[in-house]
């Protein structure tokens, strides 16, 4: 399977990085191909809704690092949305990447991709992840894609917290068993 990870975290060794490392380790054991796009370290211009792209009929006016991501997204079987919780939503870096889906909308919408959400945050409350989950779910409804799993690491200020609470193991198992979940 081809898996694209869209990582919105600006922390190379943070909690989300740990969860993604474990997820990737699981996918490698299962023999899958992974393309990781670390949005915080890429040049991604925000979409300005100029509509020159025609949702995929023409090239986007911004020729930035998204140009390399688009073909990977198109061939992906699974897309992983990963972000630490910032004000109960995804990071601006990840949201900018998702907004730029517009440039190839006609090729993504209705393509039947499977998706996963990986998020971490310090708030341990059940409600803490509702905002990011709702945003994710609405994007999937629009794109007509299907959620196949989530790792929601609540109450994790550090990667050690995520390790101790078993979220790394959960991410690993999700990666290892992704093909079964994607059926």
Features from the language model and the residues they span:
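Short, solvent-exposed loop/turn segments at secondary-structure boundaries
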Residues: 127-130, 160-165
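N-terminal beta1-alpha1-beta2 submodule of the flavodoxin-like/Rossmannoid cofactor-binding fold
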Residues: 1-82, 88-103, 165-183
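Conserved adenylate-forming
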Residues: 106
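A charged, well-structured terminal subsegment
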Residues: 136-153, 162, 172, 177-181
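Short glycine-rich anion-binding loops that position phosphate/pyrophosphate groups of nucleotides
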Residues: 85-87, 122-123
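Short, glycine-/small-residue-rich phosphate/pyrophosphate-handling segment
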Residues: 92-93, 109-150
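Short beta->alpha junction loops
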Residues: 38-41, 153-157
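A short acidic, helix-capping loop that chelates divalent metal ions and anchors anionic groups
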Residues: 120, 155-161
């Amino acid at each position: 399977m081809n898996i694209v990870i869209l990582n919105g975290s600006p922390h190379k060794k943070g909690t989300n990085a740990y969860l993604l490392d474990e997820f990737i380790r699981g996918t490698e054991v299962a023999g899958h191909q992974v393309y990781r796009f670390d949005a915080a370290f890429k040049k991604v211009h925000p979409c300005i809704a100029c509509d020159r792209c025609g949702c995929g009929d023409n090239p986007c006016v911004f020729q930035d690092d998204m140009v390399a991501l688009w073909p990977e997204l198109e061939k992906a079987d699974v897309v992983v949305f990963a972000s630490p919780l910032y004000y109960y939503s995804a990071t601006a870096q990840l949201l900018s990447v998702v907004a730029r889906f517009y440039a190839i909308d006609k090729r993504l919408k209705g393509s039947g991709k499977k998706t996963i959400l990986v998020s971490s945050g310090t708030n341990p409350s059940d409600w803490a992840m509702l905002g990011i989950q709702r945003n994710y779910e609405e994007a999937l409804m629009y794109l007509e894609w299907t959620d196949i799993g989530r790792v929601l690491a609540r109450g994790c200020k550090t990667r050690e917290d995520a390790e101790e609470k078993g979220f790394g193991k959960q991410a690993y198992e999700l990666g290892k068993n992704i093909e079964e979940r994607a059926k």
